[in-house]
Regions:
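Acidic/histidine-rich, metal-coordinating catalytic segments
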Residues: 278-282
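Extended C-terminal subregions enriched in glycine
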Residues: 254-273, 277
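A contiguous, surface-exposed recognition patch within enzymatic or periplasmic domains that forms
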Residues: 242-251, 255-260
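Active-site microenvironments that recognize anionic phosphate/pyrophosphate groups
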Residues: 1-164, 170-242, 250, 264, ...
């Protein structure tokens, strides 16, 4: 009888952060592709674009003028998804038509004045300033709101509407779905195991190594065992840290290095500006101890086979459960095989 081999046979993997299963079909990686293809950006961007709403010194669509900033620049989104003064929604006992008010704010973080440089092309010093800005925004907004979501959508394939490298921070008066799910499942694990889920997970991955993509003194980036997206990664501190605001100076500067190495490997994989959505999850600002939480960042890139072929979450994924072709170990191996020095910086 044929023995099960995860490299050859379909199987499911459990994501303890979401409580959901992922169908892995490694034998499908060899199938031919005749579907839609992305058009990778090949245009060389200038360091400053006079028509860009985010460049230093330019006027935005609202008429407000950006300062001549030299590092990061933060402003309230001109088309914010949340407002701080939303009135209370009327209460309803209808179990099928429930509604609640949502308050908050949405801000834009310009990573640097350089219109042409994404995260992997910035210096470690510039990336350290970005991490500091993430910390400052999280600390400020956490005084008012229970959940602060820092994130970046990189590339048109991920819906980014402006090519100037930037991220966002949204603060919510509520715990969003993903955060609520992670909070509940980490809490349940902590109650059962008396240790934080992702602290235990880091130790498992450090001992294994097959899914490691980047390791620095204080940080580990892996393709998680339960990855859904082809080259999805999870970036975690090696020690117990609740929030990004709790990082030491050493952890912060080392995080900048880890970010540069990880995003450089992404770009080097297909020699392109690798699109992704990424964001930070940490303990909510709810007045509790939250020892079950561990700070971490998710990177969700859509590309699958090349710079032009992406993964689509459709059909079976929408109606049944998420499916992937590459195993997490195969994806990590491919990312490890490329340099962590960006191809534009290495001269390759």
């Amino acid at each position: 009888m044929t023995q099960f081999n995860p490299v050859d046979h379909p199987h499911r993997r459990y994501n303890p952060l979401t409580g959901q299963w992922i169908l892995v079909s490694p034998h499908r990686a060899k199938r031919p592709w005749q579907g839609a293809q992305e058009t990778p950006a090949k245009q060389v961007l200038p360091a400053h674009d006079p028509d860009c709403f985010l460049c230093a010194g330019n006027v935005r669509v609202t008429g407000d003028k950006n300062p001549n900033y030299t590092e990061t620049y933060v402003f309230t989104n001109d088309f914010a998804a949340l407002m701080s003064d939303t009135p209370d929604a009327p209460e309803s006992n209808d179990p099928l038509m429930r509604c609640q008010s949502a308050r908050g704010t949405s801000r834009v973080i310009c990573f640097s004045p350089d219109h042409s440089k994404t995260l992997p092309e910035l210096s470690v010093a510039a990336l350290t300033e970005i991490v500091k800005t993430w910390q400052e925004q999280t600390a400020e907004l956490g005084k008012t709101y229970p959940w602060v979501q820092v994130f970046e959508n990189k590339g048109a394939a991920m819906g980014c509407s402006n090519p100037h490298p930037h991220g966002q921070v949204w603060a919510n008066s509520f715990l969003p779905n993903e955060a609520e799910r992670e909070d509940r499942l980490q809490r349940e694990y902590f109650a059962a195991q008396q240790s934080p889920m992702l602290v235990d997970y880091v130790q498992r991955e450090l001992a294994d190594g097959s899914r490691t993509v980047v390791e620095t003194e204080h940080w580990l980036a892996v393709v998680p065992y339960w990855a859904a997206w082809p080259f999805e990664t999870l970036l975690l501190p090696k020690t117990h840290v609740l929030r990004i605001t709790d990082l030491t100076d050493a952890q912060r500067s080392d995080l900048a290095l880890a970010l540069k190495k990880l995003t450089s490997r992404y770009d080097n994989l297909f020699q392109c500006s690798f699109p992704y959505s990424m964001g930070w999850h940490g303990a909510p600002f709810n007045g509790e101890e939250n020892q079950h939480w561990q700070l971490h960042a998710h990177f969700y890139p859509p590309l699958l086979r090349s710079a032009t072929v992406r993964k689509f979450m459709v059909g079976y994924e929408m109606l049944a459960e998420t499916q992937r072709d590459l195993t997490a170990e195969q994806a990590a191996e491919r990312l490890r095989a490329v340099s962590d020095i960006h191809f534009r910086e290495s001269g390759v």
